[in-house]
């Protein structure tokens, strides 16, 4: 029996870094939401006791560096699973883009193998396992919209924002998340109002949400990568209601409610940026069905 699982991308509507922890991680407070740009994960049982990664994307590692591989290995080791698995990954989410593509692939693998191998784990249990793989994996196990705290693994679900378009643009550069965090001086920069964002979402106040978007990591990435700053400026100029970098970058997203304006922004960005997507926010959390 083969199993297909969707692995949607995420954006950060608000991302704050509070301080560096004794364990080397950073304490964060974020509002994240899934969007309907998704990788496609196909899980194919194997006769031998191996884990294989299959992908046509040359940027996807096919060994232990791949987070989906790590997810499968974690379940095999934890529950003494002797069956092998091939994980076919069709990438639609740009790689190393600040959209949690790798983390979402891992989360989809956890959810899918939980079903395929009849493990009977809850989403909470899968999210706890996911935290061992990466900071964004726990959120990606649940999906929907949530506050993430700790190093990103403590998840509190909240309602989805009001319906709107999300336009994404990724320049053809890579950004090292570790390097961005290394260069972040949390005591010397302005911090976004994460609680205000949460309140605005509960009120379904689109205008307030647009005013409150914020990402503390922009302080590092925009200075080092002028291409990202340029996309932000152009997206604003083309008429997006709010513009923000997602994660550590380099992807920039804009929020917009009107179809005509969306088309104008999309066409304008396509003039100088190869990877541009127009998507919607996914309001629903994942289920175990």
UniProtKB/Swiss-Prot annotation:
NCBIfam families: ispE, PRK14608.1. The keyword Kinase applies. This is 4-diphosphocytidyl-2-C-methyl-D-erythritol kinase. Pathway: Isoprenoid biosynthesis; isopentenyl diphosphate biosynthesis via DXP pathway; isopentenyl diphosphate from 1-deoxy-D-xylulose 5-phosphate: step 3/6. Signal peptide: none annotated. Belongs to the GHMP kinase family. IspE subfamily. It catalyses: 4-CDP-2-C-methyl-D-erythritol + ATP = 4-CDP-2-C-methyl-D-erythritol 2-phosphate + ADP + H(+). Catalyzes the phosphorylation of the position 2 hydroxy group of 4-diphosphocytidyl-2C-methyl-D-erythritol. Its EC number is 2.7.1.148. Keywords: ATP-binding, Isoprene biosynthesis, Kinase, Nucleotide-binding, Transferase.
